[in-house]
Amino acid sequence: MHKTASQRLFPGPSYQNIKSIMEDSTILSDWTNSNKQKMKYDFSCELYRMSTYSTFPAGVPVSERSLARAGFYYTGVNDKVKCFCCGLMLDNWKLGDSPIQKHKQLYPSCSFIQNLVSASLGSTSKNTSPMRNSFAHSLSPTLEHSSLFSGSYSSLSPNPLNSRAVEDISSSRTNPYSYAMSTEEARFLTYHMWPLTFLSPSELARAGFYYIGPGDRVACFACGGKLSNWEPKDDAMSEHRRHFPNCPFLENSLETLRFSISNLSMQTHAARMRTFMYWPSSVPVQPEQLASAGFYYVGRNDDVKCFCCDGGLRCWESGDDPWVEHAKWFPRCEFLIRMKGQEFVDEIQGRYPHLLEQLLSTSDTTGEENADPPIIHFGPGESSSEDAVMMNTPVVKSALEMGFNRDLVKQTVQSKILTTGENYKTVNDIVSALLNAEDEKREEEKEKQAEEMASDDLSLIRKNRMALFQQLTCVLPILDNLLKANVINKQEHDIIKQKTQIPLQARELIDTILVKGNAAANIFKNCLKEIDSTLYKNLFVDKNMKYIPTEDVSGLSLEEQLRRLQEERTCKVCMDKEVSVVFIPCGHLVVCQECAPSLRKCPICRGIIKGTVRTFLS
């Protein structure tokens, strides 16, 4: 990356030659597709300004090249052009007009036109490659372009490695420190129009830079140094140190490791905002809030995902804070930690100390697994006292007096407390939530009734899933019959067969049957009747199977519990990748990251998925 003057002139080739070259480039292709993207480029570069004239009216008596050279880019409206530096807009061009002279006459204080004229008089205009520009001018935290070129280009040394001019200009200024941009979060929020995909705003903000525009121009909040024309392999912190080694921010900061990003195309605020074009207007959380917290819309219902940790959330409610939800469910997200700080994450996690344990404890519950999806309950010893407190507020009592089912009220209040950390404050809020919960519950019951009518066998298998894990021993014959009937493929067959222990084979087989549905359940029933009549009778005739826990894993660390779950299972949808996503609220861990977004209901308990938590193991 070299430090060069921002003025770039291209004498020599005719405009038609330049235009034909540009039309073959990605830059002009992007411009032609959408004039709205014009601010994607650094218009301090004459070549970029030239690219905007591809749709300039043919009858205008002033050449596009002379307009571009005078600092103007085309706005896309009639013959109106605009200066990239001072913002002057001109139109109604007439024969004999000189863009440079008109620019100088109407806006003599424009720093670009001043330097262009002085450079022309001094015959100092030279071709330069579009390398990184570094300036050490004073800057306030604004996106107004008129303040971007307050210094003299001629003061910069032609030697790209000589930083003397930068140091001299910097030392002559008053204090450039910007208190408004002193936090990483504040700097990050300035990048909503950031044009580059290969350099993330989070990295730039961490290196002390905030976005000022146009193009990819950024400035340091501490020393005021400016950089632009970033290249794919540039490191923001290294470039900062190289050009502004005496910056107080660099002297007082410790460079930390970069963090990995799950979806590179969504790392800018602007990119995430674009995904919310069809965001449902009924959702009470605004796209701006979600995008700022790292989330982008996946195009279904109100489902969003974090570009960094890939965590997914849905079913947003009035009063939800995306940052709080981010910290609650995905506390290891590095973007979250960078933006909000570890103290914020710890404070949110402190409100829900047993959240992950609760998810794990519900992932393999006993009893009727075809019943309503379990609500995440308080930890042992907390339930009775906290239940009494939360159910005795005036607002909750009012809801009970209206005739709402007590269990439904209790579940709704618990969900509210787990989501926001507080109970309902108004009767209107809780009544609205209860009405929605009733509608959702009725819909679930209808769907479950339809499923049970279609196949009572599948419901019995789901209900006795844990017991079947223990008691099913004739796995391979059933597996072969499923393959023969083309219910599963050879890969799915072999994955289950390769498990070294029968209980693991049984676990994989039962969960696969639940995912495959009625056809698999019928084959399972027929095979079991022939091979294991006792188990068949207990399951399908007497309907009286018992599950007896054989190992207490509660004493194991959460990480070890998760590790065991992952080692035991492959994704029940693709039967290829390892499971890595825990469903909320049921807590089942049965699918991989790629398959989870396509599911509305958990394939094991058929409960509606209201969120996902991706498991990260070191």
Swiss-Prot record:
<dbReference type="GO" id="GO:0016740">
    <property type="term" value="F:transferase activity"/>
</dbReference>
<dbReference type="GO" id="GO:0061630">
    <property type="term" value="F:ubiquitin protein ligase activity"/>
</dbReference>
<dbReference type="GO" id="GO:0008270">
    <property type="term" value="F:zinc ion binding"/>
</dbReference>
<comment type="function">
    <text>Multi-functional protein which regulates not only caspases and apoptosis, but also modulates inflammatory signaling and immunity, mitogenic kinase signaling, and cell proliferation, as well as cell invasion and metastasis. Acts as an E3 ubiquitin-protein ligase regulating NF-kappa-B signaling and regulates both canonical and non-canonical NF-kappa-B signaling by acting in opposite directions: acts as a positive regulator of the canonical pathway and suppresses constitutive activation of non-canonical NF-kappa-B signaling.</text>
</comment>
<dbReference type="GO" id="GO:0042981">
    <property type="term" value="P:regulation of apoptotic process"/>
</dbReference>
<dbReference type="Pfam" id="PF00619">
    <property type="entry name" value="CARD"/>
</dbReference>
<dbReference type="GO" id="GO:0007249">
    <property type="term" value="P:canonical NF-kappaB signal transduction"/>
</dbReference>
<dbReference type="GO" id="GO:0034121">
    <property type="term" value="P:regulation of toll-like receptor signaling pathway"/>
</dbReference>
<dbReference type="InterPro" id="IPR001315">
    <property type="entry name" value="CARD"/>
</dbReference>
<dbReference type="Pfam" id="PF13920">
    <property type="entry name" value="zf-C3HC4_3"/>
</dbReference>
<keyword id="KW-0862">Zinc</keyword>
<dbReference type="Pfam" id="PF21290">
    <property type="entry name" value="UBA_BIRC2-3"/>
</dbReference>
<dbReference type="GO" id="GO:0035631">
    <property type="term" value="C:CD40 receptor complex"/>
</dbReference>
<protein>
    <recommendedName>
        <fullName>Baculoviral IAP repeat-containing protein 2</fullName>
        <ecNumber>2.3.2.27</ecNumber>
    </recommendedName>
</protein>
<dbReference type="GO" id="GO:0003713">
    <property type="term" value="F:transcription coactivator activity"/>
</dbReference>
<keyword id="KW-0832">Ubl conjugation</keyword>
<dbReference type="GO" id="GO:0031398">
    <property type="term" value="P:positive regulation of protein ubiquitination"/>
</dbReference>
<comment type="subunit">
    <text>Interacts with DIABLO/SMAC and with PRSS25; these interactions inhibit apoptotic suppressor activity. Interacts with CASP9. Interacts (via BIR domains) with TRAF2; the interaction is required for IKBKE ubiquitination. Interacts with E2F1, RIPK1, RIPK2, RIPK3, RIPK4, BIRC5/survivin and USP19. HSP90AB1. Interacts with UBXN1. Interacts with GSK3B. Interacts with several death receptors, inclusing FAS, TNFRSF10A and TNFRSF10B. Recruited to TNFRSF10B in the absence of receptor stimulation. When TNFRSF10B is stimulated, further recruited to the receptor and cleaved by caspases.</text>
</comment>
<dbReference type="GO" id="GO:0001666">
    <property type="term" value="P:response to hypoxia"/>
</dbReference>
<keyword id="KW-0808">Transferase</keyword>
<feature type="binding site">
    <location>
        <position position="326"/>
    </location>
    <ligand>
        <name>Zn(2+)</name>
    </ligand>
</feature>
<keyword id="KW-0833">Ubl conjugation pathway</keyword>
<dbReference type="InterPro" id="IPR001841">
    <property type="entry name" value="Znf_RING"/>
</dbReference>
<dbReference type="GO" id="GO:0039535">
    <property type="term" value="P:regulation of RIG-I signaling pathway"/>
</dbReference>
<feature type="repeat" description="BIR 3">
    <location>
        <begin position="269"/>
        <end position="336"/>
    </location>
</feature>
<dbReference type="GO" id="GO:0043027">
    <property type="term" value="F:cysteine-type endopeptidase inhibitor activity involved in apoptotic process"/>
</dbReference>
<dbReference type="GO" id="GO:0001890">
    <property type="term" value="P:placenta development"/>
</dbReference>
<dbReference type="GO" id="GO:0043130">
    <property type="term" value="F:ubiquitin binding"/>
</dbReference>
<dbReference type="GO" id="GO:0005829">
    <property type="term" value="C:cytosol"/>
</dbReference>
<dbReference type="GO" id="GO:0060546">
    <property type="term" value="P:negative regulation of necroptotic process"/>
</dbReference>
<keyword id="KW-0805">Transcription regulation</keyword>
<dbReference type="GO" id="GO:0001741">
    <property type="term" value="C:XY body"/>
</dbReference>
<dbReference type="InterPro" id="IPR011029">
    <property type="entry name" value="DEATH-like_dom_sf"/>
</dbReference>
<dbReference type="GO" id="GO:0051087">
    <property type="term" value="F:protein-folding chaperone binding"/>
</dbReference>
<dbReference type="GO" id="GO:0070424">
    <property type="term" value="P:regulation of nucleotide-binding domain, leucine rich repeat containing receptor signaling pathway"/>
</dbReference>
<feature type="repeat" description="BIR 2">
    <location>
        <begin position="184"/>
        <end position="250"/>
    </location>
</feature>
<dbReference type="GO" id="GO:0000209">
    <property type="term" value="P:protein polyubiquitination"/>
</dbReference>
<dbReference type="GO" id="GO:0044877">
    <property type="term" value="F:protein-containing complex binding"/>
</dbReference>
<dbReference type="GO" id="GO:0050727">
    <property type="term" value="P:regulation of inflammatory response"/>
</dbReference>
<dbReference type="GO" id="GO:0051591">
    <property type="term" value="P:response to cAMP"/>
</dbReference>
<keyword id="KW-0053">Apoptosis</keyword>
<dbReference type="GO" id="GO:1901222">
    <property type="term" value="P:regulation of non-canonical NF-kappaB signal transduction"/>
</dbReference>
